[in-house]
Every structure is written in structure tokens, then in C-alpha cells.
């Protein structure tokens, strides 16, 4: 189960953005939460909301790109096609820096962290 997704320097996001499923500050809805540890509970669903042009779609695009990249990494590692990352374009510095993605998740009771950075030419 996904605990957290982080990304940085992607489309309209220059700084790190975090999509977390960790439940904080929920008083009356505790019986709906998924226990991870005795002190950490996860939300069964998340919602992204905000004003028009606020970057909601770019959060979904970042997640989709990172998932597709991981799923197809072995197949695409031999191809010479450009990697479809789009760095933050509103300053010169960010365009030359890699885009970063990271997942924290749990499977069979074990907690994992997986992350990578990429430019259009190279994965780090």
C-alpha cells in the first residue's frame, strides 16, 4: 500500500511536493483508517483539490509518469528515446536539474522506499 509519493522539479512544481496517505488530525474517523503501526494510520483514499491552474493535474501526471517508468524500466533501458520528464520551466537553473521521484510503500508488512532522478537523457 502506498504511504507517500514525492516528486521535485516536475512541470509546475520546482520544490518538493508530497502526496501522503498518512492520517493526521482525524478525531472522529479513526475507525475508517488502515493501521500501519501502532502509531501510524493510513487513509483508505485521498483527494486532491485546489484552485484552477494550481497543479492538481501535474500531481497525477508525476505519479503516472513515475509508475510507468518503474513498470517499463527494463524494457526501455535499451532504447535511446528521450525520457519524458518535463522540468520546472520558470527559471534557468531548474531546467538543467534532474526531476526526482520517490515512493514509500508497504507490502507484506515490510516498508520499502524507492526513488530515482531523471533528465531527458539519463536516469540517476
Language model segments and positions:
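P-loop NTPase switch/coupling surface
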Residues: 1-124
Amino acid at each position: 500500500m502506498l504511504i507517500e509519493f514525492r516528486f521535485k522539479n516536475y512541470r509546475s512544481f520546482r520544490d518538493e511536493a508530497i502526496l501522503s496517505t498518512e492520517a493526521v488530525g482525524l478525531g472522529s474517523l479513526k475507525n475508517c483508517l488502515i493501521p500501519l503501526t501502532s502509531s501510524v494510520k493510513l487513509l483508505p483514499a485521498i483527494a486532491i483539490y485546489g484552485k484552477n491552474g494550481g497543479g492538481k493535474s501535474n500531481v497525477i501526471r508525476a505519479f503516472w509518469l513515475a509508475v510507468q517508468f518503474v513498470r517499463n524500466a527494463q524494457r526501455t533501458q535499451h532504447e535511446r528515446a528521450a525520457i519524458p520528464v518535463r522540468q520546472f520551466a520558470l527559471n534557468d537553473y531548474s531546467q538543467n536539474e534532474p526531476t526526482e521521484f520517490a515512493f514509500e510503500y508497504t507490502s507484506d508488512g515490510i516498508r520499502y522506499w524507492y526513488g530515482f532522478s531523471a533528465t531527458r537523457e539519463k536516469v540517476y
